[in-house]
Amino acid sequence: MKTTVLPNAEGRVLAAVDASVYGASVADHAAWAAARLGTSIDFLHVLDREAQPPTLTDMSGSLVLGAQETLLKELTEADAQRSRLNRERGRVLLQGAAERARTAGAKVAETRLRHDHLLDALVELEPGVRLFVLGKRGEHADFAKGHLGGHLERVVRAVRHPLLVASRAFKPIRRVMIAFDGSPTVLKGVEMLIASALLRGLPITLQVAGESTDTMRRAVIEVASRLEDAGFEVDAALTPGHPETVLAEAVRTQSIDLLVMGAYGHSRIRQFFVGSTTTALLRACQIPVLLLR
């Protein structure tokens, strides 16, 4: 295989934080990644336009003129107050995330407060990014139903750099599993990891879910050899069954701390958010997931 350089090797870690229970974990995962990569962190908080309630601006015919003018004035003042409080909350969130990361030993380059759509902000900032870090769910997600955050799918579809999806709580990353299907995306991802310091020195399991073919066995042997040549401790498993079931069980029984997988592709394991495979996997695995392009 030809060695691939990790995209934007000089870029920073960009971590998007909000008021969800994932905020602290995002900061912790970003600090871990930045330390491994030898880079700094930019923290981003977006005052999402979609989250702003509509302002009542046209009430002609519904109220007498004086009452309408009074109410419009009160609504304008309430809007201004809400905007001020949201900005202040955003600054507090960013300050808290930055302090948490610095306490963990990370270098924080910038904190960014944007009034924008999250996706637009991430795409605009991507040229300076080496790795994105987002929480699995945002502050508006339906936790009772276990839904993934509404932004996550759109972000994964749009960005071109690796994305670390933080779990609800951070714990030290000691063992890694790569969901391997022999596809070009995953093969390229392995080369990216070899070229990167992110997982260097960590033991890796190559986990294949589904039919064990001669072609797949050869691919596993080749990739395992490449990783071993790069200094990784590697083992491999080929397990029949549905990917979401096999991988979730393997993560649990082998005490895996980080799952690595390709974000897109035509095989069942990489049909991200098309059908239920990866959605079910992200919901079932209570660990961070590194998505590669």
Residue ranges and their predicted role:
Residues M1-T3, A9, Y22-H29, A35-R36, ...:
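Gly/Ser-rich helix-loop-strand patches that form or flank binding pockets
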Residues K2-T76, A158-H161, K171-L238, I256:
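Small/aliphatic-rich secondary-structure junction motif
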Residues A24, A80, R84-R91, L187, ...:
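Electropositive phosphate-/nucleotide-binding environments in soluble metabolic enzymes
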Residues A30, A97, L122, L193, ...:
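Aromatic/hydrophobic pocket-lining residues that form π-stacking "cages" and hydrophobic walls in ligand
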Residues L75-E99, T103:
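Alpha-helix-centered segments that form part of catalytic cores
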Residues R102-E110, E228-D235:
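A short helix-to-beta-strand connector/capping loop
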Residues D116-L119, T239-T245:
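Conserved active-site histidine-acidic residue motif and adjacent donor-binding/catalytic loop
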Residues A224, H242-R252:
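A short, acidic, amphipathic alpha-helical segment used as a generic capping/interface helix at domain edges
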